[in-house]
Amino acid sequence: VEGLYISPEQAGAQNQKQIKAFDPAEYHAICEAAEGHLRRWSVAPELPGADEFARFARDNRITLSIAHSDADFDTVCRAFEIGYRHITHLYSGCSSVVRKNGFRIAGVVEAAYYLDDMDVEIIADGCHLPLSLLKLITKLKKPEHIALITDSIRPTGLDVRESFSGSSDDPIPIVVEDGVAKLLNRQAFAGSIATSDRLIRT
């Protein structure tokens, strides 16, 4: 599961209407409905209730992953200590260095490099991350802590230019061009259309 408990500031192509605060009754119900098949959950650890969620995930053998997060460096390091050991699609929907009142604040990306045992995913489709960042990631992270992912969505493998992301009940229109899926305003990617072999070739 990716969401529902993510940062609106790092939502990317996620449906803003489906972003929620941690709700124990809700995530207990989701886990129960999954009947033991829920193996990983990607959330933003800076949100209130993330610690309680971490305990719940551990009790239910669910791998915790950081995704669509605006957390600062210290928050990620603390999250790592309580069980958040994975980062979903590094650089995509992740905070990085920002300036606040003149001071630089490190984020998820910097913590990913600092924490040797933090696993990271990379969308190596040739679009989401330039070759320079792929080189940096593979130089600073050990191979056993890097996972290639497609992050592919609906139009993958189809000869279409227009499609949608999310539920058909509340679709987010997307356009396919330049080898990637984009939001209609072209200000952000909506997902990948890559297959696994493309990641290896990149």
Question: Model-predicted segments: where are they?
Answer:
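His/Asp/Glu-enriched, well-ordered alpha-helical/loop segment
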Residues: 104-122, 126, 138-202
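Active-site glycine- and acidic-residue-rich loops that bind
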Residues: 46-48, 61-72, 122-139, 146, ...
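Histidine/acidic-residue-rich, glycine-tolerant segments that coordinate divalent metal ions
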Residues: 2-105, 157
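A general structural signal for short secondary-structure boundary/capping elements
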Residues: 42-50, 113-114, 132-134, 196-198
